[in-house]
Amino acid sequence: TDLPSLSEVMTVVEPLGLVVTDIEILRLHYAETLRQWRERFMKNRDEAVKIYDERFCRMWELYFVICELGFRHQNLMVFQLQLAKNLDAVPLTRDYMIDWERRRAVEEGAKRQYAA
């Protein structure tokens, strides 16, 4: 099956009465993710062959390469939608996301400090 385009997703979302409050287009992010997954897989390939088999490993190598090439060169992309029931459900800018990430980083740092 094909990955749905943004317009195809929107035709399903719109009749639900949901409002799109944010869209993020992650252009080459998934290609990079697939590349890194493939590198990690290859570093552990011998172990994977022992657990599964050679056919399994070849299948995953092929999957990682084909998918990475598709996302890198064939205009495939991942997009994230933020949907809400109300237009004013989230702030007007993404600043609240940054503030949340900062608070989370501080909390994680404190947890590590006290765990040591």
Residue ranges with predicted function:
Residues 1-89:
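Substrate-binding/catalytic lobe of Class I Rossmann-like enzymes that use SAM or dcSAM, i.e.
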